[in-house]
Structures are given as C-alpha cells and as structure tokens.
From Swiss-Prot:
Pathway: Carbohydrate biosynthesis; gluconeogenesis
Catalysed conversion reaction: beta-D-fructose 1,6-bisphosphate + H2O = beta-D-fructose 6-phosphate + phosphate
GO cellular component: cytosol
Name of protein: Fructose-1,6-bisphosphatase class 1
Amino acid sequence: MLKLSEFLVQQERQHAVADNVLTLIQDIAATCQAVAREIRYGALRGNMGSAGRENVQGEEQKALDVISNDIFTAMASKQPHVAAVASEEMAQAQVFAGKQGKYLLVFDPLDGSSNVNLNLSVGSIFSILPAPEGSVDEASFLQAGSRQLAAGYALYGTSTMLVLTMGHGVHGFTLDPDQGEFYLTHPGLTIAASTEEFAINMSNQRFWQPPVQRYIAECIAGSSGPRGKDFNMRWVATMVAEVHRLLVRGGVFLYPLDSRAVGRGGRLRLLYEANPMSLLVEQAGGLATTGHRRILDVEPAGLHQRVAVMMGAREEVERLQDYHSFTDPTA
C-alpha cells in the first residue's frame, strides 16, 4: 500500500499539484494524528468535559475543542506557506504577521465534539484556499468553495482515517498507529447515483420547510409510497461520520433550513463544514446543494455564515432541488 507521502508525490507528477500544497497536507495529516492522540487519552487526562465557555457560535466548548483548535493553530503558525487561519472555534481569523504564505487554512478542529464523551466517532475538517497577493485579512477568506485547492477530513473512529481531495478524485488513508503513517486504503471513492438510505435529524421534522417534509415523507412511505422502494434512516450527529458513510456506502445527508434558523440561513457553517464536504462529495460524483443553489457557488458574506445542506447521491439531490424549485429561496 502507498504511504500518504508517496501518494502525494504521484499527485504532483500526474496532476501538477503545487508541492507547497502537498507539504501543507502532510503537516495537516500530522496534526490530525496529534488530535487523535488527545482524543484517545482524553478521559485519562481529564479532558472529556466542558471548557467552561461558549464559542462564537454560541455553543458550549468542550475541552477537546480548545485543545484541538490549539493544535491546528500551532501547526499553521509554524507552516511557512500558511498566511492565516480561520476556525469554527475562533471569532476572528488569525493572520500571521510577517509571513508571505500563499495559502489560507480553514478548519473545524473537532466536529461532533458532543459525541466525544460517548466514545462515538468525531472528526476534523479542513480546507485550503489561495491567499491573495499582498496583504491578508479576514475578508481574504470570503471565497466561494469552488476556489478551494484541497479539502478533507480526519475521522477518529475504530481507526483514524484521512480522506482528502485535491480536485482529482477522493482518496482515503488509514493510520497505522505503530508506524505513525497513513496508508492508502480507499482509493478513488465514489458515491452511487441512487440510494435507499438517508441521514437526517428527525427530531426537527416539525420545523422543516415543505420540500424537505415532502421528500422525507416519501422516503418513509417506502415501497407502498410514490418512491416504490424502502429506505433506511441513519443519524450520527457528526458530519464527518455522515459524509464518510456517503463516500463508503452511498446515501444522502440533509441538514436543511428550518423555521428556527431562517434568519441565519441554516445550521452548518459554510466555510468550515459545507464547502470542504461539498468539494469531496462532488469529486466523488455526488451533488451538494442548499436546495436552491450549488453550495460551492455560494459567495460567503462572513466567516461564520451558515447554509442549508443536502448532499450525496446525485438522483436524490436532484429530486430535492426539483422540490425546492417551487419555493421562494429567500423565505
């Protein structure tokens, strides 16, 4: 099996991926190993509880949220090619003074942290964007997801995996903890166009808009309903785990707009969650939409902007887009 480092050399030769991007990806991989180690020892070190404060999202921070964020930020501050970082856990972007890096790093350092003390799967999500020439500031991060140079996630589960794309397919690597190396175990991941599996938080059903109500009702009706086939529902409450299932087994993942989040545009963060995952899903042959437009075409208005998310099997996402075409996108 190929080591991650060997695979990245191949990418440089076959697709002319910039070597600076590849170096950054290797540093991100090492960072994810460090985060995995902190999670593994979390209970033994007393780091499974709350950090005693809220993040900019108004969510309670776990101690491991803060630790993971510090690990990512420390790596980026030393990485010569990173000019600035933005994190779901930080109110503002951090620009590294005196650095002339070509890239911006965006990350959710610990996705699904509410699951960490239950010993369920959690993850880290990252995205690499081009830095503008000249000075870098917070506005530099407000780029459409289609401009991402690379994106990926680490999944901390029964094994630690790194799944990434540099715009030439999606590939999964599994960590050998004894050697400290990621090996290519899931080359060329793809999402089947059709599926009988959906992932959504059904407890929010009464708040959904009519198109999603209709779609889920048809799925639940199964073989006796208009779809003529039975569906299974899944829900982990960790986006990394949900998207990983899409890439490995297929399906569709929904975190739609609901009546409580209309003013915010949705629940999931565009820069830290929706964009990197949308790039992965599209590179695997799936689709990703807000219901009204392609997620990767959304122009961010702020670092912590939120959007509705529906992604996965092409036929299902197209159906959801069709159902949304009869509704007002501003409602």
